[in-house]
Amino acid sequence: MNTGRRDPVVTVQGRSTEPTYEVRGGLEGDVFPVFANYASFQRPTERETGTVTVTVTNSTDSLVRNRVAVQVQGWSDQEIQVTEIAAGQVRKLLFAPTFRARLYQNREITAATALVSVTDMGGHEVFSTTVPLRLRSADDIYWGANFEYAQFIASWVTPHDPRVEAVLSRAKELMPGRRLPGYETWRAPGVQEKTTLAQVKAIYRALQRKGVSYVKSSSTMGAHVNADVTERVRMPHESLGHVSANCIDGVVLYASLFENLGMDPVIVLVPGHAYVGVRLAQDSTQFLYVETAVTGRLPFEVAVKSATAGMAKYSESQIIRIPITQAREAGIYPMPASSKEAQSASVDAREANQNSLP
């Protein structure tokens, strides 16, 4: 990822007749799980970012063929790339080995080591080194300068989380006919909009009855600690498990609920705050916006008015909109839940279904 910052570098200089290798790890050594997960879905040749970058400089007068292997010991699978570098050329290889579930269980900054090994095509090792890494909490998002990585907040939108589905089971009990149909495209747009409004209100009331309330908690630690670029964001299962959320936590929770229903959610960032919106009908250009921070204490109608009034204070140039559908099309998928979290959420979901609202 090109952030304009100087990353830690490990360089080993060979003789002038041999290639040289330079290894960089993360962002100043920090590995954010959201970026690692995104890059691991991509083919190496399509990546613009990686967990580990290996730069091969062929200072010889002949073609060099290498087999390069990278693994974060104890945390990831091994990724192997085979490359050819023409005489006098430089090749940058971006590695994003698939991480094991424990990375997504991690809630504190943790030290790790990347092992890099290079062999020739005959299997002889020509270079090896280790690079220290700091694995960030799975909750940490790096917004970047001017929120250039804001689209990655879509990884916190987890529509198929069992706890999200449990909320929807409760919300449908508050709907006429006990249905949450999402968009019914065969209906007239005006009817769709009324149905969407009713569904969003039912979800809001279900979260109120569950006791979800606002709690400010966004501190994080690491090399990137500027509150303007790095923030802790709870996953929806955490917010529901602790029945507490700050504004951005609530936004990704609501967006998860909307996406589960096949609706089109949008996350809206303004200076110092965030709102969630949902398209009123499938082909509509109109969105319904909600102030999620007041879920625990104010009626739904007030939450809608508060969001509309809050957004009206800013010019379009100050507003960042992140349509979740577009993020998915760009390859930004939900971060995986650990097996422990999934099991706990499934138990909660079963209990919720057994105790649905009357």
Model-derived segments and spans:
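A structural boundary/capping signal
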Residues: 2-358
